[in-house]
Regions:
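Structural preference for beta-rich elements and adjacent junctions enriched in aromatics
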Residues: 1-205
Length: 205
């Protein structure tokens, strides 16, 4: 379901508990484990999409998709996701704010978005998806089934991500501290300004 704030997604996977594969990792790391992912074509026309994945254990993955199947993990969005083991398998929940995604301008707030869902079962090394779009076909993003959303008018957003890091050099017996921040300002749903102060590309998310 969705609200003016964002898109909410949950899934419950039935699977024998002894077959579950849970591995922790840093963000955006592709590791063989159970996973569920959701791709959202906010353009509604197959121009671009965002993908979000939650692995069993809670590690997150995300990025963008360009036509037709150009996946990238260079984009990281401020969204929430969690997983949990259950008696019959495992479950996933996601909260995806509209404000982090580019949405075409709409006076009424009504839009069509494309949705694609994929599940990975690591124990048998298989993926299942809806809709079933074979990798041998050229069309992918443009074939996402459309869902109409109404009354979505995300407000202007200013997002601030500070960071601090510290490193120790055991050879020189020295320490280094760094601090900085990333700033995101979205005045409209189709425009975003991004800035960084003293960026540390090795900082831990």
């Amino acid at each position: 379901f969705y609200t003016e704030r964002g898109l909410y997604f949950s899934a419950s996977m039935t699977q024998p508990p002894e077959t579950l594969i849970e591995r922790l990792s840093a963000r955006d790391q592709f590791v063989n484990r159970d996973r569920i992912s959701l791709s959202v074509d906010t353009s509604g026309t197959g121009l671009y999409a965002y993908w979000f994945a939650v692995n069993l254990g809670g590690s997150l993955m995300d990025g963008t998709i360009l036509p037709e199947r150009q996946y990238s993990s260079n984009w990281d969005g401020p969204w929430r996701g969690a997983s949990q083991r259950t008696e019959t398998g495992w479950s996933v929940e996601m909260m995806l704010p509209w404000s982090m995604m580019t949405l075409p301008t709409s006076d009424s707030g009504d839009r069509d978005i494309g949705i694609y869902i994929q599940r990975a079962a690591a124990s048998i090394d298989e993926d299942w998806a809806y809709p079933g779009l074979p990798r041998t076909q050229n069309q992918f993003l443009s074939r996402f089934p459309k869902t109409k959303i109404k009354g979505i008018k995300p407000k202007q957003q200013l997002t601030f991500y500070p960071y601090v890091s510290s490193s120790l050099d055991a050879v020189d017996d020295s320490t280094t501290q760094k601090a900085g921040f990333d700033l995101f300002w979205r005045p409209t749903t189709a425009f975003q300004v991004t800035g960084s102060f003293n960026p540390d590309f090795g900082n831990v998310e």
